[in-house]
Amino acid sequence: MVYFMFIMLVGLILGLMAVASNPSPYFAALGLVVAAGVGCGLLVGHGGSFLSLVLFLIYLGGMLVVFAYTAALAAEPYPETWGDWSVLLYVSVYLLGIFFVGKYFFKEWGGLGWVGVEEMSNLEMIRGDFGGVALLYANGGIMLVLGGWVLLLTLFVILELTRGLSYGTLRVV
């Protein structure tokens, strides 16, 4: 299980680097899907199945809409790929930064970092994930509604930006 979680952590870092290096909106959307899937898999591995499902739906439902309309707005005839020199420079700087930060904090990263939610306490009556669900709908209900409203507002802003003169979102770029 530790090896599986380590591979998922490496996949999360690679997915986030694909989004941050941003060669083209097409590849950044692919990196976002990889990062969201692997990050939610990490949460499932640590015992947060409901939270990972909610985050996965928010990422794919909200952010991929933004990336789809960004790709429609910024359609390039020859998009940059991950093999271009500028993108490789960004990726190498990110890898060096991760290496030096990892080397600096290596001693503090040991210990309980691989322990799931249920392995910390033996006499709990409910799982840790279900306690989080209760807090999400009780105390965090306002933030849940606010987050949904912000995603809806973002969708309308992107639709308005890509609308064009009078052709709607199906205009020729």
Curated annotation (Swiss-Prot):
Class of enzymatic activity (EC top level): translocase
GO MF annotation, one: NADH dehydrogenase (ubiquinone) activity
Entry GO CC: mitochondrial membrane
TM helices/strands, residue ranges: 1-21, 25-45, 53-73, 82-102, 141-161
Keyword field contains Transmembrane: yes
Pfam families: Oxidored_q3
UniProt keyword list: Electron transport, Membrane, Mitochondrion, NAD, Respiratory chain, Translocase, Transmembrane, Transmembrane helix, Transport, Ubiquinone
EC nos: 7.1.1.2
PANTHER family: NADH UBIQUINONE OXIDOREDUCTASE SUBUNIT ND6, NADH-UBIQUINONE OXIDOREDUCTASE CHAIN 6
Job of this protein: Core subunit of the mitochondrial membrane respiratory chain NADH dehydrogenase (Complex I) that is believed to belong to the minimal assembly required for catalysis. Complex I functions in the transfer of electrons from NADH to the respiratory chain. The immediate electron acceptor for the enzyme is believed to be ubiquinone.
Similarity annotation: Belongs to the complex I subunit 6 family.
Protein's name according to its UniProt entry: NADH-ubiquinone oxidoreductase chain 6
Gene field: MT-ND6
